[in-house]
C-alpha cells in the first residue's frame, strides 16, 4: 500500500442493509478504485447505485460491511481531519456567524481561539466571503452558504475533500458559478477532490476522471478519463470532445437495453391513445 500511486484508495467495498422482512439488501458490491494526488474524480451513476453511501464510507460516517478505504496507505477508521466533507444540504449552524461556523471545525480539532479566528478569516478571504464574516447563515444565499461550508471543510487543511452533490439544491445559474469557483479553489491549493453528482455535464466539466457505477447492487462500470482541456469555461460544453464524452458516460449509466423497454411502453401508450381518438 505504501507504494500506491493513489492518495485515497477503495478496496473491495461491500455495503449491506437489513430489510424489515429479514432479507439483506446489498447496496455496494466489491467496489474498488483509487484517487490520485490533486486529482478531481467524480462518481456518477443511476439512482440506487450507492454513490452517496460510498462517499459516506470514505468519510467515516458509515461503516462498510466488508472492504476498506486507505488514505496515504493507512486504513481509514472513523472520521478524521484529513478528510473534509461537504453535503448537499446546508449544514451550517444557524446560531453561529459565518466566521464562527468556520472556527467551529478548527476548535474541535484543537486550535486555540485566536489561531482558529485567524485561520477562519484567511479561508473566508479565499472563498471571497471575508466581508460577510459577521453575517448569519439565514442572511446568505444558497451559493454563499455552500462557500462557507467549503471554507469550513478546507480550513483544517485536509488531504482529501469529499463532496456529496454539494450543488444539487442550487438553481442552474448559481450551480454554474459554484462549479467555476470550485475549480479555481482546487487549482490554487493542494487538495484532492472526490465528488458525487447525478449531473452528466457537471461530472465532465469538473473532473479529471469519472467513476461510473451500475445499480442493484452498485458496482464499478467503467473509469472514464476526461480529455477535455483545462481551463474549462462555458464554451467547453460545446467542444466535440466534451459532447462525445458526455454521450459515452450517459450510455454507461443508461444503456440502450435499459431505455428501450421504456420507449416501447410509451409507444404502446401512444398507439392506445390514437385508437381511442379514432373511435
Task: Name each model-derived stretch.
Residues 44-46:
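The feature captures the beta-strand-to-loop junction immediately N-terminal to the Walker
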Residues 86, 150:
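Hydrophobic anchor residue at the start of the ABC signature
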Residues 161-164:
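Catalytic Walker B motif of ABC-type/P-loop ATPase nucleotide-binding domains
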Residues 135-138, 156:
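Conserved signature/switch motifs of ABC ATPase nucleotide-binding domains
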Residues 96-104:
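Short coil-to-helix segment of the ABC ATPase nucleotide-binding domain corresponding to the Q-loop/switch region
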Residues 103, 107, 114-132, 184:
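Conserved ABC ATPase "signature" region
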Residues 67-78:
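Conserved ABC transporter NBD signature motif
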Residues 59:
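Helix-to-loop junction immediately C-terminal to a conserved catalytic motif
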Amino acid at each position: 500500500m505504501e507504494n500506491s500511486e493513489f492518495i485515497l484508495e477503495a478496496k473491495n467495498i461491500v455495503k449491506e442493509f437489513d430489510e424489515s422482512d429479514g432479507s439483506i439488501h446489498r447496496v455496494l458490491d466489491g467496489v474498488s478504485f483509487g484517487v490520485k494526488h490533486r486529482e478531481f474524480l467524480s462518481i456518477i451513476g443511476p439512482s440506487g447505485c450507492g454513490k452517496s453511501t460510498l462517499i459516506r464510507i470514505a468519510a467515516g460516517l458509515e461503516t462498510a460491511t466488508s472492504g476498506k478505504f486507505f488514505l496515504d496507505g493507512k486504513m481509514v477508521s472513523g472520521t478524521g481531519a484529513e478528510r473534509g466533507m461537504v453535503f448537499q444540504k446546508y449544514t451550517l449552524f444557524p446560531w453561529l456567524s459565518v466566521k464562527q461556523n468556520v472556527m467551529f471545525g478548527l476548535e474541535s480539532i484543537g486550535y486555540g481561539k485566536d489561531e482558529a479566528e485567524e485561520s477562519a478569516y484567511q479561508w473566508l478571504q479565499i472563498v471571497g466571503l471575508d466581508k460577510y464574516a459577521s453575517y448569519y447563515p439565514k442572511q446568505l444565499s444558497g451559493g454563499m452558504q455552500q462557500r462557507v461550508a467549503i471554507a469550513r471543510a478546507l480550513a483544517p487543511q485536509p488531504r482529501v475533500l469529499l463532496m456529496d452533490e454539494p450543488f444539487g439544491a442550487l438553481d442552474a445559474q448559481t450551480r454554474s458559478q459554484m462549479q467555476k469557483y470550485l475549480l479555481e479553489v482546487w487549482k490554487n491549493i493542494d487538495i484532492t477532490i472526490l465528488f458525487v453528482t447525478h449531473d452528466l455535464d457537471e461530472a465532465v466539466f469538473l473532473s479529471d476522471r469519472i467513476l461510473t457505477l451500475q445499480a442493484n447492487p452498485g458496482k464499478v462500470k467503467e473509469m472514464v478519463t476526461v480529455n477535455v482541456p483545462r481551463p474549462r469555461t462555458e464554451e467547453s460544453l460545446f467542444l466535440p470532445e466534451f459532447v462525445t464524452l458526455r454521450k459515452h458516460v450517459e450510455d454507461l449509466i443508461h444503456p440502450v437495453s435499459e431505455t428501450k423497454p421504456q420507449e416501447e411502453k410509451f409507444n404502446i401508450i401512444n398507439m392506445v391513445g390514437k385508437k381511442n381518438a379514432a373511435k
